[in-house]
């Protein structure tokens, strides 16, 4: 099951992957919620091994 957000990103609930509609990149979230509150408005940008602790758009 996937959730598509207004910005076009999709979050796959089962795999925890977030995919970009613009670049086609897939972002692993390692089982953590890839969104930071505020109504799931701001996706984290994922870098291997760690997260930024603030909302960050994908690029």
Curated annotation (Swiss-Prot):
A Gene Ontology molecular function term of the record: structural constituent of cuticle
Keywords from the UniProt entry: Cuticle, Pyrrolidone carboxylic acid
InterPro entries recorded: Cuticle_2
Pfam families: Cuticle_2 (PF08184)
Residue numbers bearing the Pyrrolidone carboxylic acid modification: 1
Name listed for the protein in its UniProt record: Cuticle protein 7 isoform b
């Amino acid at each position: 099951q996937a959730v598509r957000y207004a910005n076009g990103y999709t979050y796959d609930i089962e795999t925890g992957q977030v995919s970009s509609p613009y670049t086609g990149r897939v972002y692993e979230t390692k089982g953590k919620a890839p969104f930071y509150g505020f109504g799931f408005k701001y996706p984290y940008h994922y870098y291997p091994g760690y997260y930024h602790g603030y909302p960050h758009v994908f690029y």
